[in-house]
């Protein structure tokens, strides 16, 4: 994920990403002030930072689905957990 600045949007913790995912499920695209609500749910990020993070996520998904990047090859170790 390329960025022109080294703001807090450049680095997201695993916890922040999980909070981000949950907030996206809670606040859909029709929610008024969606990005402010998502930012509040994540904590420590601005509405602009969460909006940008979402745009990068969508771009990554589109790139994967278009075949630009191969799907990861997860090997099974024999345990189906």
Swiss-Prot record:
Tissues in which the protein is found: Expressed just outside the vascular bundles in the rosette stem and the leaf traces. Not detected in floral primordia.
Chief subcellular location: nucleus
Matching CDD domains: SANT
Gene Ontology cellular component list: nucleus
InterPro entries according to UniProt: Homeodomain-like_sf, RADIALIS-like, SANT/Myb, SANT_dom
Subcellular location field: Nucleus
Stored Pfam families: Myb_DNA-binding
Domain SANT: from-to ranges: 7-62
Keywords: Nucleus, Transcription, Transcription regulation
PROSITE patterns the UniProt entry points to: SANT
Gene Ontology molecular functions: DNA-binding transcription factor activity
Domain of life, per lineage: Eukaryota
Miscellaneous comment in the UniProt entry for this protein: Assigned as a member of the MYB-related gene family, I-box-binding-like subfamily.
Function field: Probable transcription factor.
Protein's name according to its UniProt entry: Protein RADIALIS-like 3
The species this protein was found in: Arabidopsis thaliana (Mouse-ear cress)
Classification of source organism: Eukaryota, Viridiplantae, Streptophyta, Embryophyta, Tracheophyta
